[in-house]
Amino acid sequence: MDNNETEPRILLVEDDKADREKTLEALRKYGLGYEVRVVTGGHEALDYLLGRGRFHERSRNPLPDLILLDMSLAPIDGARVLARIRDNESLKAIPVIILCSTPEERGRAMVESVRAHAYAVKPVSADDMRDLVRLTYPSVTSYAAMRFE
């Protein structure tokens, strides 16, 4: 996060509209002061993170402080997106919470295999989302209203 900014940025990468709305609703419930950007696919996520195409203006499309990443994206899945993130020097330190539909036991193994910070089984409750974000990005202390773009 830039020193001039006070609002932590979250990038939500989710292609399913219903899951996207449920995740946004979970984030909104506590109004924890995040700026949430949404992209709907793996290619779009990489374009955003790498500042390509319509996301080329970094001042308008700043890097996130935290990424919420759906694992079942198509045509490029979340594991491949995360591998690209981890292989990029300017992106690899960004914490990533993977969002998956798999049972809890498989989710834990998936976190290790794809080098994520945490995982959540969809749909994610507001309480679980709050706890995951705070655990993964502990410097978030603001309780200001959220801004969605």
Residue ranges and their predicted role:
Residues 23, 109-111:
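Residue preferences within the helical output face of two-component receiver
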Residues 69-71:
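Active-site residues of response regulator receiver
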Residues 99-100:
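Hydrophobic/aromatic residues positioned on beta-strands within the core alpha/beta folds
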